[in-house]
Design a protein with these regions (language model features):
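Catalytic Walker B motif of ABC-type/P-loop ATPase nucleotide-binding domains
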Residues: 77-80
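Conserved catalytic motifs of ABC-family nucleotide-binding domains
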Residues: 73
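Conserved ABC ATPase "signature" region
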Residues: 19, 23, 30-48
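Conserved ABC ATPase signature
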Residues: 52-56
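Hydrophobic anchor residue at the start of the ABC signature
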Residues: 66
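Short loop immediately C-terminal to the Walker-B catalytic DE motif
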Residues: 83-84
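ABC transporter nucleotide-binding domain
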Residues: 95-187
């Protein structure tokens, strides 16, 4: 499990941090060393083993916490808002890491309120509102359902035909409806 806000032991080196968590799962020293080396390689932190955790950037700490979460080879990796607080470059690096984990057959459950961040990662999603699953399925089907249920509503003071002409030129507009001076536009992207 990787929470949205994660704590790290700042006074530990990266290798000590991994040793600590490996020992929590009753792994032997040999197992911890082997698995830690593989995981730190996976998250691109091999060169940081002897660096104190508090000197790592937020993105590096995030990747370290993924390595920590994987140390016992879980069948499910749960991530809560994994891109929270990351700069754009770190977000991209983290997304590449998650794609790599998915290719290695990890099952990953991600909690996020930013659907666009999930587009390249997920095979299916569920939308929860007020603690209730309101939609679930393939991302493209969910996006179509959301798009079709939430048109952009425009009130035009004059020149409705001109407004319609402009909207029809947009390749993202999938459907339009007109009621006097009110236009509803649905988008496909």
């Amino acid at each position: 499990y990787l929470p949205d806000f994660f704590g790290v032991y700042d006074n530990l080196k990266v290798s000590e941090y991994m040793d600590f968590y490996g020992s929590m799962y009753r792994m032997t020293s040999r197992e911890i060393t082997a698995v830690s080396n593989d995981l730190l390689e996976l998250v691109n932190l091999s060169d940081k083993k002897e660096v104190y955790v508090d000197t790592l950037s937020r993105g590096m700490k995030q990747r370290l916490c993924v390595a920590r979460a994987l140390i016992h080879n879980p069948s499910l990796l749960v991530l809560d808002e994994p891109n929270s607080g990351l700069d754009p470059r770190s977000r991209k690096d983290f997304q590449l890491l998650l794609q790599r984990l998915a290719r290695e057959d990890y099952t990953i459950l991600i909690s996020s309120h930013i659907l666009s961040e999930l587009a390249d990662l997920c095979t299916s999603i569920g939308v929860i509102n007020g603690g209730v699953m309101v939609q679930q399925g393939k991302l493209e089907n969910i996006m179509l359902a959301i798009d079709s249920s939430n048109p952009l509503r425009i009130t035009v003071l004059n020149q409705v035909p001109k407004a319609l002409e402009l909207l029809r030129q947009d390749p993202q507009v999938s459907r339009l409806s007109v009621d006097e001076n009110k236009i509803a536009a649905w988008f496909s992207g």
